[in-house]
């Protein structure tokens, strides 16, 4: 049986992690495009 607290933490961390990875990728892409120009 999965504890509600643990389930809530996991469900809360997944979107935050995805948002962090997307933001980091966007920053790297933005920085790379500026260097090329």
Curated annotation (Swiss-Prot):
It is found in: Cellular thylakoid membrane. GO terms for molecular function: electron transporter, transferring electrons within cytochrome b6/f complex of photosystem II activity. One of its GO terms (cellular component) is cytochrome b6f complex. Disulfide bonds: none annotated. Its main location: membrane. InterPro entries: Cyt_6/f_cplx_su5, Cyt_6/f_cplx_su5_sf. GO terms for biological process: cytochrome complex assembly; photosynthesis. Belongs to the PetG family. Component of the cytochrome b6-f complex, which mediates electron transfer between photosystem II (PSII) and photosystem I (PSI), cyclic electron flow around PSI, and state transitions. PetG is required for either the stability or assembly of the cytochrome b6-f complex. This is Cytochrome b6-f complex subunit 5. It comes from Thermosynechococcus vestitus (strain NIES-2133 / IAM M-273 / BP-1).
């Amino acid at each position: 049986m999965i504890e509600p607290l643990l389930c809530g933490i996991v469900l809360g961390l997944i979107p935050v992690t995805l948002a962090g990875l997307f933001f980091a990728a966007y920053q790297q892409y933005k920085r790379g495009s500026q260097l090329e120009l």
